[in-house]
Structure formats: structure tokens, C-alpha cells
């Protein structure tokens, strides 16, 4: 090959390489442009990702699927149809309680970033269930956990996190500044009620889908407080009960009807010998039933039921299987307050089925330890202490605490009835475990089923003290 041929050959190869390089660059530019277009596309665009569709509603991601394209998370969304939770169905027939969730938050918090909390509760929309809780503005195993045995402080807030997960700064959503709270979903949006402020002038702030819609001022100036569990929504209206007045004597109790976060009606109960605190409420066949805490003089639980016009009935659970703590040993009951060991109390719940009642209670009648569910087939109206079913949930050697009801509507479950459920708070630390400087809790929950269930103990299980306590 002569020199001219060599030059021509080398030149041809160089041109070919240049053309190939140019084509690769053009392809890369097209790829980057296409990726950018996907990422910045309209939020209303619907994408199919492994045959799963993500739903976006009211600024809350309901179902998540992430697809990695060039190391960038792309989320597709579309509107989800809202419904109106009717609450007209009856409670599902059940024979026992199946374990639903356990968050193990104290165990996880010994090493991870987990909030110091109390008063957890669960509430469900037609799409999902969420855990709500009152944080102390502090993390477990941190210096700010010191002194969190205190109930009311300006650092407390109502927050929510996915069901069954330990509440942390990474998975939790702020709802309201509050040291007493409630929340519920009407099928279109979340109503939250957060009470904060001084004991003699606290205010309940109402929010609907995160926007302040109203306030309720303390009317007795004696620690306005509410349920510490879910409110009840039926046919577009939500209902809650608040207490204002002494915790050891007659107080004032009001039912509020709320629509899209605004109070449309309220009444004060005429209940001079009753005491209602921290009510656990649920819908049943178009009415609201609330089972509450008598902190004044009853070791059996008071109840109030009302319709959507706020016409109400009141009473005490008659059964000799007493539901409060402290309480006497089971004996002859009463449809009025049972005053033996009636002072003080703990938040709890029951479910009424005709003349029968499922009673949730601590296993200990003096300490907040253990938990059990008891079916008394005549206990709503009869005063004997006979029962036919007892299901163990937490052993008497392990700490429990508050408990409360929540329900799953047919719009969520696909059933033709309202499924009854409950949660139990498992409190650890002060005041009973004085090797710690803090007070917090984890939680478990159960739902009613008409099939086989287990008798066991699902305790908190954390080993104390923590590093911060030593």
C-alpha cells in the first residue's frame, strides 16, 4: 500500500468513527430529553408500572409504586373517587378477635429514631387505615425524652403514620398541635381534632384535609378534653364527644356534629350522676354508640348512644364483669355506677350486640397489666357476672394501658357489615418502671372475625432501661 492509499484509509476510518460517535451523542441527548419529559409530565397523567396504578387523593399518596429510570423515581397518579361512608350497616357477627397489627415501637426505638408517644389510636377511611398518636416532641433514648410522663405540654402533637409501623420522623405526618385528640374520615376527607393550650383556656382546633375549619373553646375552663380514639362519620357528618370539668366529680359533656370540619350542631348531656371521659365510639345501624371512662365513681363503664339529630340515651353497662381499672372482683353488677373501687379509671371500650356485650379490659383489677376480651351474652342488660367466652391478648405479667375501638366500613372491606376492631396501648417507663426517665408506648390491634382465633400474649417486649436511663 503506497503512502497515498494509507492516508485515504486512515482518513476513512477516522470519518467512520466520527460518524458513529456523533450518532451515539445524538441518541444520548434524545434519551435524556425523553427521561426529563416523563419526570416533568402532567400530574394527571396515568402510567402503567408493572400493572399497578398509583392513586393520588387529597395530597396523600394512597398506594405507592416507584419505577427507577436513570436513577430517578417517577410516580404516576390519578384521581380516586370519593364516597360517603353511610354507617347504616350493622356490626359483623363475630366469634373472636384476630391479631391485626403490632408495631414494636419501643423495641425498635432502643436503637432507631422512634417518637416518644402515648394515646395511639387507629382510624380507617374507605381506602386505608392509619395509626394516630400524640408525640411528646422527642425521640426514645434521647435527652428530650426526660419528663415525658407529663400529659399536657406545648410540645405534644397529633401525628399519623402507616398502620403497624413504628412512628418515626421518616414515616410520620404532622396533623395538629395537641395533647388531646381525635380523627376520622367521612369518605371524602380526614377530620382531625386537636386540643392544646392552658388548662383553664384550652382550644380544640378542627381541621378538614389539613386546613383549619373551626375552633371550640373550653367552656368550663377545666381541661377541655376529647376521645383519644376515632370519631364517627355517617352520611357526611362526623360526631365526637368532649368533656370539660372535674375528673373526680360531675363535669360537662357535649356531643358535636361536624360537617367538612365545621360544627353544625352541639348538645350538652343531661347526665348529673354520670361521668364521661375518653369515649370510644363506633357506628351501628345508623346510630353512634360510645362507651366511656368514669373517672369519678364507677368501676363499670358508662355509655351514650345517639342518632344523627343528636337525640340520645344514656346508661351504664349492667354486667357484673366490670370493664374499668381499678375495679372490684367480678360480682353482681348494676345498671347504675358501681361505686366499689370506682374512683380513677382507664380509657377502654365495649361492643354492644343486642343484650350481649364484648368487654375489653385489663387482666389485673388494680394495675394496667394484661388484657382480655370477654363475651357476656346478656351483659348489656343483666347484672350477673356469667360469661361464655374469654380471649387472652396480653398476659397479666405484662404492661398494657389505654384501649379503644375502631371500625372498618363495608366500603373498605367489601363486606356487608361494619367490622369491629380494637387497639391496646402497651405503656412502658414511668411512673411504674422507675428505672427510666421517660414514658412511651407501643400498640397492638385486633379485628373481629367469625373464624378461628388465638389465645396468647402479644406484649411490648422491650428490655429496659435504655442507654439514656443509665
Swiss-Prot record:
Its EC number is 3.2.1.18. Glycans are attached at residues 44, 58, 63, 70, 88, 146, 235, 434, 455. Homotetramer. The lineage of its organism: Viruses, Riboviria, Orthornavirae, Negarnaviricota, Polyploviricotina. Residues 36-90 are annotated as: Hypervariable stalk region. It is a single-pass type II membrane protein. The keyword Lipoprotein does not apply. Ca(2+) binds at residues 294, 298, 324. It is an enzyme of class 3 (hydrolase). It catalyses: Hydrolysis of alpha-(2->3)-, alpha-(2->6)-, alpha-(2->8)- glycosidic linkages of terminal sialic acid residues in oligosaccharides, glycoproteins, glycolipids, colominic acid and synthetic substrates. GO terms for biological process: carbohydrate metabolic process; viral budding from plasma membrane. It is found in: Virion membrane; Host apical cell membrane. It holds the Pfam family Neur. Residues 1-6 are intravirion. N-glycosylated. Substrate binds at residues 118, 152, 277-278, 293, 368. It comes from Influenza A virus (strain A/Russia:St.Petersburg/8/2006 H1N1). Residues 91-470 are annotated as: Head of neuraminidase. Disulfide bonds join 92-417, 124-129, 184-231, 233-238, 279-292, 281-290, 318-335, 421-447. Belongs to the glycosyl hydrolase 34 family. InterPro entries: Glyco_hydro_34 (IPR001860), Sialidase_Influenza_A/B (IPR033654), Sialidase_sf (IPR036278). GO terms for cellular component: host cell plasma membrane; membrane; virion membrane. This is Neuraminidase. The influenza A genome consist of 8 RNA segments. Genetic variation of hemagglutinin and/or neuraminidase genes results in the emergence of new influenza strains. The mechanism of variation can be the result of point mutations or the result of genetic reassortment between segments of two different strains. CDD domains: Influenza_NA (cd15483). Keywords: Calcium, Disulfide bond, Glycoprotein, Glycosidase, Host cell membrane, Host membrane, Hydrolase, Membrane, Metal-binding, Signal-anchor, Transmembrane, Transmembrane helix, Virion. It comes from the Viruses.
